Amino acid sequence: MKNLNLISFISLLLIMSFYRCDKQSDEFISDLDTTSFVEAFLAFVFDQDVEELVDDAFAQESYSSKTSDISTSGISAKGPKRNFKGDRYGKCATITVDEENNIKTVFFDGECFGKRGQTRTGTIVITYSETKGEIGSFRQVEFDNYFLNDVQIEGVRRYEVIGIEEGVDKTIQMTLENGKMTYPDGSFSTRSKSITKYISYEGEERVSTSVTGNASGVNSDGSAYDMEITSPILFTKECAKELMHKKGKIPVSGVKRIVKGETEMIINYGDGECDFVAEVTKDGVTETIDLKEIKRKRKFRKLKS
């Protein structure tokens, strides 16, 4: 009789254990996938990276006296060949200037390792206006087989100055058409956007960038989304070195709203502290995340799909 009771008790424990495991498995499966968030985040910081690189391409004053004739991936450029100051984007990153046609071409000859640990390959072609730093002046950026951290970047980006304050600080309208990011696993996301950037300077040095605007597109899982910045997203020079990371420049504050169908997600980048922390809120539940660590195709711990 005692043996029978013992067997029954053990059987009950096993049943409860299986039930608990199944329940935990169901809860894990229902946890919200991080892919949409990470793709939106990468798109945002990669744009900042491209903009900074383009600014640096225009900031280089010294170049070799030799005229180069370079051809990479079907794109050729003839003109003075320059290097980025301090090999910031790797020793194999060079700039050629076609002053007659107002074109700068940035070549990454092989896999170039930058100061932040980022890798780049391919070509960036920058067309620019005759005027610089004035209302109406512009830069247009296109890519040829360009990869940043093994993610292929495509699309046409246009930056146009629409306002100047005190002769220094600028308001820039940025648009993206046919934007596409292809990930190492072959999946891709698409997007278009229109944003406004207010850039504050001290002398010729950028102190901060405040970003507003919206975007829309399709994630790699095939779901359409809309993004709106509801509180300006801020990047600062003060935190730039502390927040250096291979994913790109990390914002210190600002809020954006992402809507997929009937699902809404709020991302809060903080209140100005120099950290990698952000808060993601869905259905009234908030999860704190580390922007250095989060990756695509993982699960949030608290947020449910």
How would you describe each model-predicted region?
Residues 23-305:
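Low-complexity, intrinsically disordered segments exposed to solvent
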Residues 1-30:
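Bacterial Sec-dependent N-terminal signal peptides
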